[in-house]
């Protein structure tokens, strides 16, 4: 496979990837009506303001122009950083389950069924970086306004992870929330947020859990 990091990538070069339920080369399907559970988490969107530049917001008129251009070098670099983050054995490939975590790092929340359908398009159940760019490039162009930069998220994660052990403890997150939001959140609200974030109940927030939190 070629090194996409060296050559500007054209969205029209290959179009074999598609989101399940979407036209070929189209954007992610629009979500259905919000459930009661989803409405209950809407209040946590205030957490998105904690990282400031982590979210890139563009006016719709500007975002519309993103579809008909090449990926910029810094965008390919962002995809490469995300890919390498989950290519843990450094063999140049990631499996479809790792692909799901990698996509979440970039701000996408694929369902298990979507990942299974995507995996059926993958030869050998793995993707290399060129395949990854083919899959994520159109999404990056189509939804620039919703993207979350992995580098900015990493920087924000390190701000929370004050002892540098790779995980955010309940105490670290509580202290950060209090410092950043002050009295805007009660102790009960902080505890509810922590309970919602700590998906595996180990008392620690790892990077993937942090990404899920910031993507709300």
Swiss-Prot record:
GO molecular function, one term: calcium channel regulator activity
Cellular localization per UniProt: Cytoplasm, Perinuclear region; Cell membrane; Golgi apparatus
Gene3D superfamilies attached to this UniProt entry: EF-hand (1.10.238.10)
Alphabetical list of SUPFAM superfamilies matching this protein: EF-hand
Disulfide bonds: none
Expression sites by tissue: Expressed in the inner hair cells (IHCs), outer hair cells,(OHCs) and vestibular hair cells within the ear and in the retina (at protein level). Expressed in the retinal cone type 6 ON-bipolar cells and type 1 OFF-bipolar cells (at protein level). Expressed in the organ of Corti and spiral ganglion neurons in the cochlea (at protein level).
Composition-biased stretches (Low complexity): 20-29
Description of the deletion phenotype: Mice exhibit synaptic hearing impairment and impaired auditory brainstem responses. Enhanced inactivation of Ca(2+) influx in inner hair cells (IHCs), whereas its amplitude and voltage dependence of activation is normal. Reduced normal spontaneous and sound-evoked firing of spiral ganglion neurons (SGNs) seen. Mice exhibit normal retinal morphology but altered light responses of retinal ganglion cells.
GO (cellular component) term, any one: perinuclear region of cytoplasm
InterPro entries hit by this protein: CaBP1/2/4/5, EF-hand-dom_pair, EF_Hand_1_Ca_BS, EF_hand_dom
Topology with respect to the bilayer: Lipid-anchor
CDD domains membership: EFh
Keyword DNA repair belongs to the record: no
Lipidation (N-myristoyl glycine): 2
Location of the region described as Disordered in the Swiss-Prot/TrEMBL record: 1-41
Main location: cytoplasm
Residues at which Ca(2+) 3 binds: 198, 200, 202, 209
Residues that bind Ca(2+) 2: 161, 163, 165, 167, 172
Residue ranges annotated for the EF-hand domain, each copy included: 74-109, 125-142, 148-183, 185-216
Pfam families: EF-hand_7 (PF13499)
Claim: Nucleotide-binding is one of the keywords in the record: no
Amino-acid positions noted as binding Ca(2+) 1 in the UniProt annotation, renumbered to this chain: 87, 89, 91, 93, 98
GO biological process terms held by the UniProt record: sensory perception of sound; visual perception
Biological role: Required for sound encoding at inner hair cells (IHCs) synapses, likely via inhibition of the inactivation of voltage-gated calcium channel of type 1.3 (Cav1.3) in the IHCs. Required for the normal transfer of light signals through the retina.
Protein name as it appears in the record: Calcium-binding protein 2
Designated gene of the protein: Cabp2
